Amino acid sequence: MPIWLGILVGVVALVAGVALGFFIARKYMMNYLQKNPPINEQMLKMMMMQMGQKPSQKKINQMMSAMNKQQMK
């Protein structure tokens, strides 16, 4: 086997592995986000109402900013 053919096979295998890994990771993340959607203000408001609290916009904004800060850590 010539050396250039070995290098070519290695490069093609590397590119194919990267492409396959990208599509598998993309599919996994789309499934994950479909099963566990991120919490938005509407969902937070509904949760507060279910807990018996009256949701004010100020409280919702405080909780959203606290959740965003916690995610950044």
Curated annotation (Swiss-Prot):
One of its GO terms (cellular component) is plasma membrane. Keywords: Cell membrane, Membrane, Transmembrane, Transmembrane helix. Pfam families: UPF0154 (PF03672). It comes from the Bacteria. InterPro entries: UPF0154. It is found in: Cell membrane. The chain crosses the membrane at residues 3-23. The lineage of its organism: Bacteria, Bacillati, Bacillota, Bacilli, Bacillales. The keyword Methyltransferase does not apply. The keyword Cell membrane applies. This is UPF0154 protein BCB4264_A3788. It comes from Bacillus cereus (strain B4264). It is a single-pass membrane protein. HAMAP family: UPF0154. Belongs to the UPF0154 family.
